[in-house]
Amino acid sequence: MLIRRPPDLLPSEITPEPLARGRRALLKGLGAGAALAGLGLPQISQAGSLGTLRPSPLSSDEKLTPLKSVTGYNNFYEFGTDKEDPARHAPGRLKTRPWTVTVEGEIKRPRTFSIDDLLKLAPLEERIYRMRCVEGWSMVIPWVGFPLAELIRQVEPNGQARFVEFVTLADPQQMPGVRSPLLDWPYVEGLRLDEAQHPLTLLAVGLYGEVLPAQNGAPIRLVVPWKYGFKSAKSIVRIRFVREQPRSTWMKAGPSEYGFYSNVNPAVDHPRWSQATERRIGEFIKRKTLPFNGYADQVAGLYSGMDLRRFF
């Protein structure tokens, strides 16, 4: 799918059908006036630089998707169902300071982190990752963040923790989409504990060397590059370590369409989108989709012996 949608493209072709049907109510909500809000992190000016970043050997050397596309074309249904809605509605609405993330559950050291605490948790790195949307388009994004494993090490999961659940902000005053029953808010995602501890799994606080824009999930979001983009929860406010597999938002919305693992797999199509190929934003010729989004060498061992058609 190209960054510019054809004028005759129906909403139901790019969003799940229940969301397309509820769109009118959401757009009505977006007409409400926005409260002024800051975008930057503490001690960092709005859209400010994140300073010197440590390069990462885990980065891709592929051509980057332009910043304008990364920040202007994305899914963030809390602000609207069109790709351009987050850029239109999130800046100036989403208050990202003060911000806290509560970490709780099956851990020895439960804690509520301020965004300043999180910024000091580990050296920030630039991670250039491929991002693959289940809708059949992709980008290459230079994220800034630190491994989720660093936070996990701080809170010390106990022997009962098997999964990690991520809960995002759901504030109808800031996020007009939350007023509409398009999804079961707040947005919830989850990972197996070993997936969360994998070196590739990132908590991102920026992109392109700058503070994370509101429309991209500020001030802190998850990035799991071998999974479809919807697994990477935005604007996280709570992280829970749990015994049972979390039931994610998209699993509730379409259990036959969205599985818990949601690993990029060209051999398993979504009911409405082929996963065999993808359109890299900014390119005109489709390219073949790689298993695990090209990260098979690093992560395939996590799923050894699993039927990836069944556990999609």
Swiss-Prot record:
Keyword RNA-binding included in the entry's annotation: no
Entry keyword annotation includes Ubl conjugation: no
Q: Which cofactor does it need?
A: Mo-molybdopterin
- The UniProt record lists the EC number as 1.8.5.-
Which keywords belong to this entry? Metal-binding, Molybdenum, Oxidoreductase, Periplasm, Signal
* Superkingdom classification of source: Bacteria
Task: Give one Pfam hit by family name.
Answer: Oxidored_molyb
Instruction: State what the entry records as the consequence of deleting this gene.
Output: No effect when grown in presence of chlorite, growth of a double sigF-yedY2 mutant is completely inhibited by 20 mM chlorite.
**How does the cofactor attach, per the note?**
Binds 1 Mo-molybdopterin (Mo-MPT) cofactor per subunit.
List, alphabetically, the Gene3D superfamilies matched: Oxidoreductase, molybdopterin-binding domain (3.90.420.10)
Q: Where does Mo-molybdopterin bind?
A: 74, 77-78, 133, 168, 216, 221, 232-234
Q: In terms of one coarse class, where is the protein primarily found? A: periplasm
From the UniProt record, list the reaction(s) this protein catalyses.
L-methionyl-[protein] + a quinone + H2O = L-methionyl-(R)-S-oxide-[protein] + a quinol
- Annotated signal peptide: 1-47
HAMAP family listed in its UniProt record: MsrP
Name this protein carries in UniProt: Protein-methionine-sulfoxide reductase catalytic subunit MsrP
Gene this chain is encoded by: msrP
